[in-house]
Amino acid sequence: MGQPGRPEFPDRAARRPGGPADVGSLVVDDSPALCAALDAGLGASLCLVADNAGAELLADLALVDHLLATGRSERVALHVKPYPYFVSDALASDVAECLAVLGEGPRGRLLRAAAEGRWTLRTHDYYRAPGWYRDAPGDLVAEWAAASLTVFKGDLNYRRLVGDAHWPALTPFADVVGYFPGPVAALRTLKCEVVVGLAPGTLAALDASGEDWRVSGVHGLLQVAGL
């Protein structure tokens, strides 16, 4: 049984079709550390950097509602793009559309949280600019630094976070994002060659599988640093 108020998840070792037999859907799974940090209050002031609109953004809003309703977060800032990199990128207008189709309960709670200043919607021109987050302007860095935890979602945000370089896959995630001004988490589906923080056994199994695992969209990861 899980803790009260915490949603139950399927077996984290569940396999995905097309993946190597001894590697699960997540090639890195730091969710136990992330959940423990949230339970310990690290998400009190959380910055969530969104990725896609549509169903994914609805899930993001459900997460924000859950974090606020359970007290795992006192304040959540949802960061979206001012203009899309890709047609699917979440914008402020998408948040409004998602709120309109949410059930009365979560919609009402989120609107009250917004009125009380516990949930804010933020954007910044740098989210649509070419460049790495290491080189982000000072006012955006200050927003990340003010958060007790920043969560980046999506493949593009991951590439910008780690610098989109040809890192050896065994390079520790914490080393690559050591510049970041506070605790950070990254969630993404692998759709490009860039990946860090793999365990040696995981990398060996993936490379031996013959699968084009870095870009196939079959695998994902959840990584944390600075918790």
Label every PLM stretch briefly.
Residues V49-L58, Y83-Y85, D155-R160:
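Gly/Ser/Thr-rich loops at beta-strand to alpha-helix junctions
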Residues L34, H66-A69, G138-A145:
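Short amphipathic alpha-helices and their capping/turn segments at secondary-structure boundaries
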Residues S45, S73-A77, P183:
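Residues at the starts of beta-strands that form the adenosine-phosphate
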Residues A55-A77:
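Histidine-anchored nucleotide/phosphate-binding helix
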